Design a protein with these regions (language model features):
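Cys/His/Pro-rich metal-binding microdomains
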Residues: 11-14, 67
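Short pre-active-site segment immediately N-terminal to redox-active cysteine/selenocysteine motifs
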Residues: 1, 5-12, 62
Length: 105
């Protein structure tokens, strides 16, 4: 599972969505995952829950923040390699590799 902690007013989130997420090789990696986009800055109670979860579990409140979970709901990786397509692609590939490694146990 790929979790995207994002915000309505997050300029860097929009940059990633336009410049990186739209690349064919990134979309191919996303096709192998369940994607969840969690908005943390809306004025509703659900966003507050997402923001609290991000801070308590990952000790950060920054956006964008990306996490890949394994089948046991444990974080496999959260270091995205920055906003560079090659680094982000490596992050996704590593998460998929770790997922299948955990799944085969």
């Amino acid at each position: 599972m790929f979790i995207d902690f994002t915000g309505i007013y997050c300029a860097n989130c929009r940059v990633m969505e336009r410049r990186v997420f739209t690349l064919e090789r990134i979309r191919q990696e996303f096709d192998k995952m369940v994607l969840a986009r969690l908005y943390v800055d809306k004025k509703d109670s659900l966003s507050s829950v997402f923001a609290q979860m991000q801070f308590e579990r990952y000790k950060t409140a920054t956006q964008p923040y990306y996490v890949i979970l394994d089948p046991d709901n444990e974080s496999t990786i959260s270091d995205t390699g920055g906003y560079i397509p090659n680094g982000f692609e490596h992050f996704l590939s590593k998460g998929i590799d770790e997922y299948f490694g955990a799944d085969s146990n």
